């Protein structure tokens, strides 16, 4: 399962770096870790956001890993706004599954979302 391999890669990053760094460091480390878990990915993927068929603009998602959208956070705890934001990105992207990974907590926080 792709999500299980993404989570395994994320756990390795968290185990190695621990909490306390900025998001970009976890993004870079995850980009280094994913290929070792046999995963193909794109980083900083732009998605179009539409309203009633009209394009409103674009948003950037942190990763798309084999059709799974992945958002990275580095906060003490995931807040409702983070969950809602990730769910909105997932709906806008058209992907079916998303992961919200928070590396800032003492233990890696993982939220799986479905569209």
Question: Locations of the language-model features?
Answer:
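A short acidic/basic microdomain associated with nuclease active sites
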Residues: 37-50
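Interdomain/boundary linker segments immediately adjacent to catalytic/signaling cores
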Residues: 1-17
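Domain-level recognition of nuclease-like catalytic cores that cleave nucleotide substrates
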Residues: 1-2, 82-83, 97-115
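Active-site-adjacent loop/helix micro-motif of nuclease/hydrolase catalytic cores
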Residues: 76-84
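N-terminal, polar/charged subdomain of small-to-medium soluble alpha/beta proteins
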Residues: 58-60
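Nuclease catalytic cores
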Residues: 3-4, 19-23, 27, 31
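Conserved catalytic cores of phosphodiester-cleaving nucleases, focusing on short active-site segments
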Residues: 18, 41, 62-76, 89
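Arginine/glycine-rich "motif VI" loop of SF2 helicases in the C-terminal RecA-like domain
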Residues: 90-96
């Amino acid at each position: 399962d792709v999500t299980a391999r993404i989570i395994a890669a994320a756990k390795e990053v968290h185990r190695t770096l621990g909490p306390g760094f900025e998001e970009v460091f976890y993004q870079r480390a995850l980009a280094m870790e994913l290929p070792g878990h046999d995963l193909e990915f794109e980083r900083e993927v732009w998605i179009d956001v539409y309203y009633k068929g009209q394009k409103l603009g674009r948003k950037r998602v942190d990763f798309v890993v084999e059709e799974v959208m992945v958002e990275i956070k580095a906060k003490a705890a995931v807040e409702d706004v983070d969950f809602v934001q990730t769910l909105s990105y997932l709906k806008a992207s058209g992907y079916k599954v998303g992961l919200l990974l928070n590396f800032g907590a003492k233990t890696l926080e993982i939220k799986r979302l479905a569209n």
